[in-house]
Design a protein with these regions (language model features):
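Conserved, structured core segments of small domains
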Residues: 1-103
Length: 103
């Protein structure tokens, strides 16, 4: 299982389109995702407002079954934190998302 943080609005748009494309797909060539043990760090580094809210916010966590992905999945080193992260090199097919968790 891999994970991706997204706004509810962007996830709703993906459901209407039938696929999900993060902005990073156009700018970097992939969609950023995380392993379970990396989610908290991602939230702290990239969504500090979430940590401050201590309550419901506009973010959801997608639980993605990597076996169901139709786009390639690769693990790349993020030198800024010295960890490898899973990256989806293409659109995220909606049926690969097995759970949507409110943050």
């Amino acid at each position: 299982m891999i994970f991706h943080v997204v706004t509810r609005q962007n996830w709703q748009k993906a459901l209407q389109q039938g696929f999900y494309e993060a902005d990073s797909l156009a700018s970097e060539g992939f969609i950023h995702t995380s392993k379970a043990n990396q989610v908290a760090g991602v939230l702290e580094r990239y969504y500090p407002q979430h940590a401050l809210l201590k309550g419901p916010c506009d973010l959801v966590l997608l639980h993605i079954d990597e076996i169901k992905l139709t786009a390639p999945l690769k693990f790349d080193m993020a030198t800024s934190v010295n960890e490898t992260f899973p990256h989806i090199y293409g659109r995220l097919n909606i049926d690969a998302v097995v759970k949507v968790e409110k943050l």
